[in-house]
Regions:
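Extended polysaccharide-engagement surfaces of secreted carbohydrate-active enzymes
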Residues: 20, 27-238
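Active-site lining segments of carbohydrate-active enzymes
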Residues: 1-37
Length: 238
């Protein structure tokens, strides 16, 4: 599961996509004991989206994967620990995948007795690959002819995001390694990306570009995986 707010198919799972889920979670919780309650099938779909879409694009299900941030990377607090409110509400709706919801709740509350799970997942519509073990989380952000590299700099945010989709590979052990990095970031030295070092960054109208190659692909059995990208920079031709 992934969420796309616009026709550029940029990954918005943890921005608009989380708000989308939260609205349904709130109403499912509000009407749970009435004749308007959501069907079990609908609740299960919502839980699947929350656990397999939202939580698996987060470091240990607690903190946003820095690799999927768009213009919101410039906002203070994006490295915060997410609230346990939504998974708690979901847990009260059904016993479906309850152990996994309990683990997310426990992790977000900072209980040291909880251990993050292990998984490898490819979000094929988003061209995003994630890999987690109990002691680290890493991801690879890519794009192809099917989607754009980055969100437009709406509201004057993310003005230096030109190269952040170019195979970016962030590694997190605690989850807060990139906290408050944005003001001092070298935007032409992005982890995992091969970037031509320019004299100055292109203008803000040159941030969003569509991929020039078709191939981004991965194989995974849910625990192990491999991912590949046929990359050609739409900014520099590299």
């Amino acid at each position: 599961f992934s969420f796309h707010h616009r026709t550029d198919w940029v990954n918005n799972t943890l921005s608009y996509g989380s708000g989308y889920a939260s609205a349904f979670i709130e109403w499912a919780s509000n009407v749970a004991d009435t004749k308007f309650r959501f069907s079990e099938q609908a609740v299960r779909l919502l839980i699947d989206y929350y656990l397999d879409g939202i939580c698996k694009q987060m470091v240990y299900g607690r903190i946003s994967d820095p690799g999927i941030l768009n213009r919101d990377i410039t906002r203070p607090g994006e490295e915060r620990v997410w609230s346990s409110s939504d998974p708690e509400k979901l847990r009260n709706l059904t016993d479906y995948r309850q152990a996994e919801l309990d683990n997310i709740i426990c992790l977000r509350k900072g209980d040291s007795s909880c251990r993050p799970g292990s998984f490898a997942k490819f979000f094929w519509r988003t061209d995003h690959f994630v890999f987690q073990r109990p002691d680290f989380y890493t991801s690879v952000r890519m794009y192809s002819t099917r989607n754009a590299n980055m969100e437009e700099p709406y509201n004057g945010e993310g003005l230096m995001n030109h190269f952040r989709g170019d195979g970016t590979n962030y590694l997190s052990v605690r989850g807060d390694e990139y906290k408050r990095l944005t003001p001092v970031y070298d935007w032409m030295k992005i982890p995992g990306a091969t970037i031509v070092q320019l004299d100055k960054m292109p203008g803000e109208n040159e941030i969003q570009k569509w991929g020039l190659t078709d191939y981004v692909g991965a194989v995974t059995d849910g625990t192990y995986g491999a991912v590949g990208l046929d990359f050609k920079s739409p900014h520099t031709g590299l």
